[in-house]
């Protein structure tokens, strides 16, 4: 019964966060304009050089990589928003309510589901306009979007932990950039790992974003994906196991 009430309360706070998004739509820039800008930038500025002139081939390679990179980048905002809410005393009011301690954070993550879904749809749709083509099936497209969103939701707990740990919302962005940039550019999102030095390839091969990107590429373009999907879900579970309790501990300490 308690779990049922906690879920209901989390859904109520999810609705609260969605209402905030409708009132401040500029918060959606990172999941609407950012994917379009990144895809255009990498395809038309760097694509010719990286793919030796074949932008279409590079687009096929690039788009799954950018899905992974942009969902990681878009996770920054949830940590910033939670940090700002704590500074405003919003969570002091929540403490007076008969709700579970994890409910405010879970509600925020549930609301982010819709942001990540919007990001993935925009990325695939804009990619299609530019010439990206799925060579598998609509069912595998849904699987690719599903695994991407699951990874994003688990990675959001990293951002929440940072948001509970640092003092200001601006610091959240700085810390998350330091984390996401090595994961993004030290992965196979933009170039093949085989073109990198051996020491960097070792990092790429264990990078969670590399496993996600490889899984999405296989689901959208074909090829063996079972191992990469398995590694991706292992990372999803690992991130939740580690960062959910860390974020909760930070939340309890701050409030």
Question: What are these model-derived regions, one by one?
Answer:
Residues 249-255:
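Short cytosolic juxtamembrane segments of multi-pass membrane proteins
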Residues 20, 51-53, 133, 184-241:
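Membrane-interfacial helix-loop-helix junctions in multi-pass membrane proteins
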Residues 43-48, 84, 93, 97, ...:
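Transmembrane helix-loop junction
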Residues 37-42, 58-130, 151, 155-159, ...:
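Hydrophobic alpha-helical transmembrane segments of multi-pass membrane transport proteins
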Residues 29-35, 167-187:
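Pore- or pathway-lining transmembrane helices of multi-pass membrane proteins that form conduits
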Residues 101-176, 223-248:
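Alpha-helical transmembrane segments and their short interhelical loops
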Residues 26-27, 60, 69-76, 106-108, ...:
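Short alpha-helical transmembrane interface motifs in multi-pass membrane proteins
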Residues 1-34:
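Aromatic- and glycine-rich beta-strand/loop motifs that create alpha-glucan
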